[in-house]
């Protein structure tokens, strides 16, 4: 529909759909070595939200349900689940044979405590319990400080976990696989105080592995023999290395020091077609976000001209070399959106295009109108991912191609999207729906970059949020 055409011209999206992974044959080994470009920010499941931290937590933690190797949801700590006719109440029966690494049983109360604790902390991760995510009854009020955590719509009945939602949403079952929904042993956590999750001694595991050692650059996990599926686990030890550059990942892989790494860039090309590499689907969007309070970026004609200058198809060929696809809108390909389960990209006839000649003509007219020699903008980004700087460099080159725009690059630890003129936003959806990709534009969710459109907000609330 026309609304999407309007939004797409405002946010200059380019989609990076896949990542190249290198895998050595570790089947016959008892130790698995993994390299990550990021660093762990926290091993506290109530706080962690970044990919690196959640990857580690998912190795030593477990949830009600989990995805298997075929990406199908299967019972984990929950033995079974029932849903009410109105889709708003979930009842989970907890397995009796699940134990913490100290021998304590994992109970339904552990989930209640964990969820209330996260919301009481008002962490970024706890937002997944609110209407931004799972829509648990009362979560919004608790997160916003209007009510106490005791009012959360979750309780224990006959040793079963009962969860009441504010409204029916299919996202709930996807989200319970995330660490913030994992159980916590209240007695143990409170005994550790502020030191909880800072060392192996201040952590408990209910998952396949338990943390053996922790440093900034490396975490070692060993098999949790008390785990209910310990006998099905072939790997005894996992070494996770952090802060590893693309070049060092490839070097370590070639030397046999690691068994798995995700890589991008020029050096990844030599693995094309080899059995040791695979292009893994990963629904990530990189958005070039304009600030709608800016004098010039608030002009749709300026934004549309900038969009015409982005050579999206060359970002894989010249920058990433990982099988990424160019964007055709705000959503990655293969993301379900409408009630008929039709992919939004298939449902839309709108296509982003590259037209340097048309962009130059438009910019000439605009520069004359604004009495400027050049448009000048600063593009702000964080270097959390190996590809970010290279993508920012390519955007700069694209936008400066007609010599009518000057772009300065600014690397920061955290982007203030409301202050930055242009910013680079990476979005990886938690679920296979449109919600996470469109929520940043919705005023009632994040409303970044001062974007405000009543038509979009109404559509997001009634169509996207309601059907997610």
Regions found by a protein language model. Give the residues of each.
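Gly/Pro-rich hinge or "lid" segments in bacterial periplasmic/extracellular proteins
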Residues: 165-233, 237, 247
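Structural transition elements
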Residues: 324-366, 384-388
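Extracytoplasmic/peripheral linker and loop segments enriched in polar/acidic and small residues
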Residues: 154, 351, 408-415, 437-468
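Periplasmic-binding protein-like
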Residues: 293, 297-338, 355-356, 391
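N-terminal lobe/hinge region of extracytoplasmic solute-binding protein
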Residues: 35-85, 204
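Ligand-site clamp/hinge motif
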Residues: 217, 225-270
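Surface-exposed binding/hinge segments that line
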Residues: 126-187
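Ligand/substrate-recognition segments at binding pockets and active sites
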Residues: 216, 360-429
């Amino acid at each position: 529909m026309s609304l999407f055409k309007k939004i797409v011209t405002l946010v200059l999206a380019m989609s990076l759909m896949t990542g190249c992974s290198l895998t050595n044959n570790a089947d016959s080994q008892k130790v698995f070595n993994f390299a990550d470009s990021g660093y762990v920010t926290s091993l506290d499941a109530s706080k962690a939200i970044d990919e690196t931290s959640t990857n580690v937590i998912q190795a030593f933690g477990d949830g009600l349900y989990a995805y298997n190797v075929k990406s199908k949801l299967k019972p984990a700590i929950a033995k079974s689940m029932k849903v009410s006719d109105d889709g708003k109440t979930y009842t989970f029966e907890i397995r009796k044979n699940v134990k913490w690494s100290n021998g304590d049983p994992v109970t339904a109360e552990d989930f209640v405590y964990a969820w209330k604790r996260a919301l009481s902390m008002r962490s970024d991760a706890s937002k997944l319990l609110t209407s931004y995510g799972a829509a648990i009854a009362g979560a919004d009020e608790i997160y916003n400080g209007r009510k106490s955590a005791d009012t959360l719509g979750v309780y224990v009945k006959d040793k079963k976990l009962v969860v009441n939602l504010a409204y029916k949403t299919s996202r709930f079952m996807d989200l319970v696989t995330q660490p913030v929904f994992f159980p916590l042993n209240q007695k143990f956590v409170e005994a550790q105080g502020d030191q909880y999750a800072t060392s192996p001694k201040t952590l408990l595991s209910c998952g396949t592995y338990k943390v053996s050692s922790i440093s900034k650059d490396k975490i070692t996990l060993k098999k949790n023999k008390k785990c209910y599926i310990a006998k099905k686990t072939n790997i005894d030890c996992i070494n996770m290395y952090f802060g590893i550059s693309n070049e060092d990942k490839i070097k370590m892989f070639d030397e046999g020091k690691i068994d798995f790494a995700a890589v991008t860039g020029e050096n990844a090309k030599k693995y094309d077609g080899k059995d040791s590499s695979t292009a893994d689907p990963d629904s990530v969007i990189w958005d070039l976000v304009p600030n709608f309070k800016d004098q010039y970026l608030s002009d749709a004609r300026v934004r549309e001209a900038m969009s015409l200058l982005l050579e999206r198809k060359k970002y894989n060929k010249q920058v990433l070399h990982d099988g990424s696809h160019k964007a055709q809108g705000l959503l990655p390909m293969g993301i379900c959106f409408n009630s008929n389960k039709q992919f939004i990209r298939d449902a839309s006839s709108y296509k982003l295009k590259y037209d340097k000649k048309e962009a130059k003509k438009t910019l000439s007219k605009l520069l004359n109108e604004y009495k400027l020699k050049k448009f000048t903008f600063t593009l702000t980004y964080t270097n959390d991912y190996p590809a970010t700087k290279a993508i920012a460099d390519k955007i700069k080159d694209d936008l400066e191609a007609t010599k009518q725009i000057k772009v300065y690059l600014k690397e920061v630890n955290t982007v203030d999207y409301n202050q930055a003129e242009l910013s680079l936003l990476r979005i990886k959806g938690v679920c296979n729906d449109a919600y996470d990709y469109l929520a940043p534009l919705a005023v009632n969710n994040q409303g970044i970059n001062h974007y405000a459109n009543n038509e979009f907000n109404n559509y997001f609330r009634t169509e996207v949020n309601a059907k997610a």
